């Protein structure tokens, strides 16, 4: 990915939206980290987070910012049910640009709905990085790479995102096999032994954060954990690689969204919005200026 332009938006707010969890604190950790890093760089006048399953919730977040120019970036892995249905409904969005009329004590505001972080082209590199980290020294030519997504019957885009990444990596001809598999749609990850033949199998969860799915659900479905364990402290599952199953070695990676370079992906989604809709970024209170504050770290 090319270096992001250096920018500063002191008159604008950034709202970063995550899923969150009522039972696992690790679920919101990446979103909170990236928001904190963006705030530290001084990129926006305001930076706040909101979550579907934690406080503050989606419906509260617009009352948490004073800016009239607001960028909203979903820290989600794909453009699917949450980004197309839930978030627009909860925030009252009507497409990429929504104008909220003035009301007593609050001027009119412009909401700029950016693409989810997971739509960024850098996802392919994050997946490959995770695979290399999980199985250092393993020859990709002797390995199957399995990318695991959630999958859902509610929106086909959830599966499309995984399959798109699998196709991109397959086209590089690095791994002996590259497959997209799922928790809740076919092909189910439970069938990994039938769908792969390589002696080494590397499994990378295509999720923003580590939580119930990567700590518990996927390990049980893979057969590397007998039953669902405790919600917290599940990172131990990644430290036991490789697992020996059916005469083959299975390597299991953590999710990709905790990568610190993910912060730059979030900023890139704001820049992409401005590039595609430049006239919306020319208002005096929303002007961008060159600044070293938002340079990549």
Give each language-model segment a name.
Residues 1-297:
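Active-site-proximal alpha-helix that buttresses catalytic centers in soluble enzyme cores
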């Amino acid at each position: 990915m090319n270096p992001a332009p250096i920018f500063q938006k002191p008159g604008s707010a950034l709202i970063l939206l995550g899923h969150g969890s009522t039972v696992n604190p690790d679920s919101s950790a990446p979103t909170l980290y990236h928001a904190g890093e963006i705030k530290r760089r001084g990129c926006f006048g305001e930076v706040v987070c909101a979550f579907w399953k934690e406080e503050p919730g989606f419906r509260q977040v617009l009352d948490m910012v004073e800016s009239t120019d607001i960028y909203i970036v979903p820290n989600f892995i794909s453009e699917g049910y949450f980004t197309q249905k839930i978030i627009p409904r909860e925030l009252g969005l009507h497409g990429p640009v929504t104008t909220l009329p003035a009301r007593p004590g609050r001027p009119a505001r412009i909401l700029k709905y950016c693409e989810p972080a997971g739509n960024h082209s850098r996802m392919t590199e994050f997946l490959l990085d995770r695979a290399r980290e999980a199985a250092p020294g393993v020859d990709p030519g002797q390995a199957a790479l399995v990318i695991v997504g959630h999958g859902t019957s509610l929106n086909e885009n959830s599966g499309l995102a995984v399959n798109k990444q699998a196709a991109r990596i397959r086209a590089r001809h690095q791994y002996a096999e590259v497959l997209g598999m799922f928790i809740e749609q076919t092909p189910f990850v439970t069938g990994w032994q039938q769908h792969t033949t390589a002696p080494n199998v590397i499994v990378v969860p295509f999720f923003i954060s580590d939580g119930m799915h990567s700590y518990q659900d996927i390990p049980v479905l893979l057969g590397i954990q007998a039953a669902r364990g405790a919600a917290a402290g599940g990172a131990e599952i990644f430290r036991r690689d490789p697992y020996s199953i059916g005469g083959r070695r299975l390597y299991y990676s953590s999710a990709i969204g905790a990568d610190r370079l993910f912060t730059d992906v979030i900023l890139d989604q704001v820049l992409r919005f401005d590039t595609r809709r430049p006239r919306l970024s020319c208002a005096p209170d929303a002007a961008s200026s060159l600044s070293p504050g938002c340079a990549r770290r």
